[in-house]
A protein has these predicted regions:
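Amphipathic, small/basic residue-rich leader segments at the start of a protein or domain
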Residues: 1-103, 124, 128, 354, ...
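C-terminal helix-coil-helix/basic helical segment that borders enzyme active sites and/or dimer interfaces
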Residues: 27, 285, 289-292, 303-356
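N-terminal glycine-rich flavin-associated loop
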Residues: 101-120, 146
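A short, Trp-centered hydrophobic/proline-enriched beta-strand micro-motif
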Residues: 132-140, 183-184
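A structural signal for short hydrophobic beta-strand segments in well-ordered beta-sheet cores
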Residues: 154-157
Length: 406
């Protein structure tokens, strides 16, 4: 416990010397009233957010506070879940740059590199991703392969010195700003199993033949992208894991994405909670019993989700893997409940801009928060994982799909 207290003090000292505490900057009617991070902001804001995030991440990395659970030889701190939780609690008290634009590289790409990368890939990429030097993106989903990822159609054919890749990816967060992409492609057909014959590659996003097109979302922003791959050359040393073993690599990334979803959602939740409290005080809802009860209910759900990851550390591998789905379900549910409360308080002012500070700003959150039911694996997929892997229930019948390649 004393060691953990010392760690908290160290984090407090580091952040306190560089950034203001959030309670010192949070005032209703003052400053920018935007509520969301890089995923929902305009493109100019997103690029600026990323610049600030990379500078902040470099500071953390140099101080040994960037990758708390990572191996020391790759720039990590070699610490455990308790320190990670303590850091998260402390950092939420400070007005630090939004690191949303770095999370795919750190929480999806980096775990796969650590688990399956060569010695060179680990030494070269892990410190770069965690210091903010490199920004990563995920190139898994396709127009006809989302939840059913094993049906992907992007192909990689072997040539002298590497591979030539052709295909299309979609819903790739931040691909227009990324340096490296974790790319899943089919390298050989396997009639017995669609998940075999897939290979993972580490794609240089500046490679000739890579075209990235941001997709306009209903929030009005364009954070997600579609990526076209036209005869893109990928060298042999960019294969991540074994040729034909891409499914195992993908599962590492997907499990880590679910596991870390709670951290990302927690940061959003605290921002929304603070602003909702201010809003309630401003419009006179703070004394309403229903408002207070729903606010407390959402916060309790949030706290439960914060302790779930630590409890999973002692679970069996099967339950621990499935438990990451529970983390994601709890996180998205807490966020949606809070946004619904804001909608009930504000009514039409949430969707019609009256010019009042801190009201219409919720509209973009309302539009964006429902995407969390899909991002990182749909709620339905998460429930299937829990049912089949943790509870041992029968597998859901898989529909027979027509082979569209004929």
């Amino acid at each position: 416990v004393s060691g953990l207290a010392e760690f908290r003090s160290r984090v407090e000292a580091f952040l306190g010397a560089r950034y203001p505490r959030r309670h010192e900057t949070l005032r209703h009617g003052q400053g920018d009233d935007s509520l969301v991070g890089a995923a929902f902001r305009d493109s100019d804001d997103e690029a600026g957010d990323l610049r600030r995030a990379r500078a902040y991440q470099r500071e953390l990395f140099d101080a040994g506070l960037a990758w708390l659970s990572g191996p020391v030889e790759y720039g990590g701190a070699g610490l455990g879940a308790a320190e990670r939780q303590a850091f998260a609690e402390v950092v939420r008290r400070y007005d630090v740059p939004d690191v949303n634009g770095l999370l795919v590289g750190q929480q999806i790409v980096a775990p796969a590199v650590l688990a399956h990368g060569s010695a060179d890939q680990r030494a070269r990429l892990l410190p770069a991703l965690w210091s903010g030097e490199l920004v990563g993106c995920q190139l898994f989903s396709e127009p006809d392969a989302g939840s059913d990822l094993a049906s992907l159609r992007t192909r990689a054919r072997q040539v002298d010195g590497g591979w030539r890749v052709d295909g299309q990816k979609v819903w790739s967060s931040g691909a227009h700003l990324a340096h490296v992409g974790e790319l899943l492609a089919r390298t050989s057909p396997d009639p017995a199993s669609r998940s075999r014959g897939l290979t993972m590659f580490l794609l240089d996003m500046e490679s000739p033949g890579v075209t990235v097109r941001p997709l306009r979302q209903m929030t009005g922003t364009a954070h997600f992208c579609e990526v076209f791959l036209d005869d893109v050359f990928v060298p042999d040393d960019a294969v991540l894991g074994e040729v034909g073993g891409g499914w195992a690599v993908a599962n590492v990334s997907l499990s880590s994405e679910r596991d870390n979803f709670g951290d990302e959602s927690a940061n959003l939740f605290i921002r929304l909670l603070d602003r909702l409290l201010l809003l309630g005080q401003e419009v006179g809802a703070a004394e309403d019993p229903d408002f207070r009860d729903r606010l407390a209910d959402g916060y309790v759900r949030h706290v439960v989700n914060q302790v779930l990851p630590a409890s999973l550390e002692t679970a069996t591998p099967e339950v621990a893997t499935a438990g990451t789905s529970l983390v994601k379900l709890f996180a998205t549910d807490a966020d949606r409940r809070l946004v619904q409360l804001a909608l009930d308080v504000l009514g039409p002012a949430l969707v019609a801009d009256t010019g009042a500070w801190g009201t219409y700003a919720w509209s973009r959150v309302l539009l964006g928060v429902h995407a969390t039911r899909i991002a990182g694996g749909t709620d339905e997929i998460q429930r299937n994982i829990l049912a089949e892997r943790a509870l041992g229930l029968p597998r859901e019948p898989r529909p027979v799909r027509e082979d569209r390649r004929r």
